[in-house]
């Protein structure tokens, strides 16, 4: 263990850290940030929630963007609505949450991505949202999403709240005429993107994929190796991929690696030493999330940052990982942690400990976008994960797409709300039914 790393971990004493954790992590970001952006309650229309709906779209044939090497492995793809939503040609019917206020402002979010609720369904979410939110003001968002509420402390309940929370932030931005990140408190106006690979099968596919990403303008790349959720656990193949991607990307390209918790402790140590040797910048989900002792050992032995948090279902789950030094950086999925509101709490909690925070981005356009707004408002993040190949997350019922500038950054949206506008004509043509 290096002296630098050991001294830093020793500094994380629970007696010193716990007061800061409670003070900052449980703070509600919305109201104070809105005031800082110059938005006052009296300036806004009636934001009482009037109606909650689910827009169910017709199945569509999904295809990989032109020139993309390889296909995602396994039926259904990653994360339900993520990636190609299964191999090219698979048919999926996507679902959008719709929340409408008395003043007619609508907020939307996807219901197709990762949710931890044990009995997730459209009708279950509708029942929750109608009973808990109709008649309430969007301005009272913290009172409805805080984990101090006993009902939201139960496993998975934050998933139900997350979809509503994201819709409400969309509404707030539209009402104020500002992109959401401006209300949260803008820290930057663009974020550097890295191409986040599919679970490809061979070294050759990864080499082709890195070249494709570089030709699209990406300056960084993350490996989702064959030993991930696609099956075919073979850490030795992972190591060959890791070496080939470094050789292809060159010495200066930031590279990240995410086996999605598929490795054993022994395998993770061997892979981690190779990541150190080749100067990778992130080792995400090196072990299953619950193996906190193994993560402590791994983090102490390696220089590559260990990144955990994607599969944590509440704010409280992060605490032992931070205090015990089981992770160098934290990560979140807003769908699991209470929406944008919960994600910003995780980011602030990490900031208390001088830690970086990497939000997850994978899935549909809106899944990318809600995390993007958090990233634009966070001082302790430098990355925007973009599903590879570029264009995979695009949907025909949106007028806007994720684009890279000439330096490989994604510029902030300028439109109000989530900032990526629905094409109502296309959406209406794709509508299968409305559940309410």
Pin down the residues of each PLM region.
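N-terminal secretory signal peptides and thylakoid transit peptides that target proteins
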Residues: 1-19
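C-terminal segment of N-terminal export signals and the immediately downstream linker at the start
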Residues: 25-84
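Flexible C-terminal active-site loop/helix
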Residues: 42, 47-50, 54-57, 61, ...
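Metal- or metallocofactor-binding catalytic centers and their adjacent structured scaffolds
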Residues: 46, 100-175
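Conserved, mostly hydrophobic/aromatic
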Residues: 104, 177, 283, 321, ...
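Shared catalytic-loop signature of beta/alpha-barrel
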Residues: 129-131, 273, 279, 290-409
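Glycine-rich, aromatic-flanked loop segments that form ligand/cofactor-binding clefts
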Residues: 156, 165-198
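Metal-dependent enolase-superfamily TIM-barrel catalytic cores that perform enediolate-based chemistry
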Residues: 190-302
């Amino acid at each position: 263990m290096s002296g630098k790393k050991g001294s830093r971990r020793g500094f994380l004493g629970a007696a010193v850290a716990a007061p800061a954790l409670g003070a900052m992590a449980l703070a509600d970001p919305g109201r104070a940030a809105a005031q800082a952006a110059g938005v006052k309650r009296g300036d806004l229309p009636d934001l009482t929630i009037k109606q909650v709906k689910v827009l169910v779209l017709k199945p569509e044939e999904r295809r990989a963007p032109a020139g993309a090497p390889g296909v995602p492995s396994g039926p259904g793809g990653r994360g339900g609505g993520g990636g190609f939503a299964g191999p090219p040609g698979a048919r999926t019917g996507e679902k959008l949450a719709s929340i409408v206020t008395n003043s007619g402002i609508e907020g939307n979010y996807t219901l197709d991505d990762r949710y931890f609720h044990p009995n997730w369904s459209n009708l279950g979410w509708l029942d929750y949202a109608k009973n808990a939110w109709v008649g309430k003001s969007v301005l009272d968002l913290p009172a409805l999403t805080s984990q101090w509420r006993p009902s939201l402390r139960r496993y998975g309940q934050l998933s139900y709240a997350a979809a509503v929370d994201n819709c409400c932030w969309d509404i707030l931005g539209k009402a104020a005429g500002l992109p959401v990140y401006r209300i949260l408190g803008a820290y930057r106006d663009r974020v550097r993107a890295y191409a986040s690979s599919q679970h490809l099968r061979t070294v050759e596919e990864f080499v082709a994929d890195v070249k494709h990403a570089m030709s699209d303008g990406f300056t960084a790349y993350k490996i989702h190796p064959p030993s991930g959720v696609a099956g075919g656990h073979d850490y030795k193949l992972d190591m060959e991929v890791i070496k080939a991607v470094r050789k292809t990307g060159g010495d200066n390209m930031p590279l990240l690696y995410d086996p999605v918790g598929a490795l054993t402790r022994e395998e993770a140590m061997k892979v981690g030493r190779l990541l150190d040797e080749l100067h990778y910048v992130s080792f995400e989900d090196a072990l299953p999330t619950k193996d906190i002792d193994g993560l402590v050992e791994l983090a102490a032995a390696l220089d590559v940052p260990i990144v955990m948090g994607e599969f944590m279902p509440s704010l409280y789950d992060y605490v032992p990982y931070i205090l015990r030094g089981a992770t160098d950086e934290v990560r979140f999925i807003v769908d699991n942690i209470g929406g944008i509101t919960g994600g910003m709490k995780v980011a602030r909690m990490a900031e208390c400990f001088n830690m970086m925070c990497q939000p997850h981005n994978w899935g549909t356009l809106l899944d990318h976008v809600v995390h993007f707004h958090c990233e634009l408002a966070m001082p302790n993040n430098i990355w925007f994960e973009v599903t590879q190949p570029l264009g995979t997350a695009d949907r025909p019922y949106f007028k806007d797409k994720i684009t890279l500038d000439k330096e490989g950054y994604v510029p902030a949206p300028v439109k109000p709300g989530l900032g990526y506008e629905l094409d109502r004509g296309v959406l209406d043509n794709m509508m299968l039914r409305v559940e309410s």
